[in-house]
Amino acid sequence: MDSILVKGNGELRGQIPIAGAKNACLALMPATLLSDEPLTLTNAPRLSDIRTMTQLLQSLGAEVASLQGGQVLALSSHALTDHRADYDIVRKMRASILVLGPMLARDGHAVVSLPGGCAIGARPVDLHLKALEAMGAELDLRDGYIHAKAPAGGLKGARVVFPLVSVGATENALMAATLAKGTTVLENAAREPEIVDLARCLRRMGAQIEGEGSSIMTIQGVDRLGGATHPVVTDRIELGTYMLAPAICGGEVELLGGRIELVGAFCEKLDAAGISVEETERGLRVARRNGRVKAVDVMTEPFPGFPTDLQAQMMALLCTAEGTSVLEERIFENRFMHAPELIRMGARIEVHGGTATVTGVEKLRGAPVMATDLRASVSLILAGLAAEGETIVSRVYHLDRGYERVEEKLSACGAQIRRIPG
């Protein structure tokens, strides 16, 4: 397996282009299953998770062509040959569950393996299933698979109240509702930009949707959806990750394609820590103000709060902050697996349940460390950029699931980083 070698060497300066959002693209791709007309996605990220979703859709009989070096995806589901999403593919990625709603809505039946993905707590799919049951679906869980069948005449509009905010469940219910008979109201729906992006794409395909970006969405089902061309929204998690690079190392970096509204709560914490964020004509410019970074407290929340997917990277910044910071993880359990690796680099971190207390040190030290999940992997790279000596991050296949060309983007700004083939 590949690893990444990082040498801490001072300030970063330059520009980093931000890719299309992985989490948005992974929801947009299954939307092709709702229509027999082509769907074209532009600004697509080039990631292993996208390739996994491509394999899954192709296994169902969909056509997926990667164009312009992978930045354009041309999809068509005019002739599905199968409605069974097998474990061998689904186990690789949790977003695979998003084929369930579209297949059920369009063709009335689907068999989907229970999903896999990052090892971050339980992350159950029960909210997805309850939403589909509210629309009349008959579900049977056996042998590790979800066997789903729509009632005669198809899914029916319903009032769906999510007991917890769930991005994936909102996406599955939203797609299913576009072809359901009647009106569906989603209450306590997720508000993330990726939800808004999916709704806009579905509307381009002919769906009737109101309220995206709020906690209540209303969908009037239609008889059929058509084709569309849609640009994938900017990846706010990649944006936030690279904003932390000059924050940790010093210097000044412009993030091309970045927008404040995608990372508002995150920017507030950066400002409190002593990091300057300015809008430019092409994106965002980030620089550390004079002196050492200041400690801040962070609590992860659903959008528009501080994103859980930036918690690990923020911890890397706070490891060398002046003072003590408290990070409270309120979205996923077991999401501090990067903390022991940062401790190997000299960080002072104490974890008690869903809370981590970080007491800043003057300097981290390079060390061999192991990535445990996607966001943990990049947090260790960020820590390595500011550490004395060499840091070798192993198991970076996690990294390739969510970041494209990370070593190229950072080295273009002066970082000493390279991939070591495994």
From Swiss-Prot:
Keyword Transferase: yes
Function recorded in the entry: Cell wall formation. Adds enolpyruvyl to UDP-N-acetylglucosamine.
GO cellular component: cytoplasm
Subcellular location: Cytoplasm
Name recorded for this polypeptide: UDP-N-acetylglucosamine 1-carboxyvinyltransferase
Principal subcellular localization: cytoplasm
Single Gene Ontology MF annotation: UDP-N-acetylglucosamine 1-carboxyvinyltransferase activity
PANTHER family: UDP-N-ACETYLGLUCOSAMINE 1-CARBOXYVINYLTRANSFERASE
Keywords assigned: Cell cycle, Cell division, Cell shape, Cell wall biogenesis/degradation, Cytoplasm, Peptidoglycan synthesis, Pyruvate, Transferase
Cell division as UniProt keyword: yes
One BP term from GO: peptidoglycan biosynthetic process
Chain positions found as 2-(S-cysteinyl)pyruvic acid O-phosphothioketal: 118
CDD domains: UdpNAET
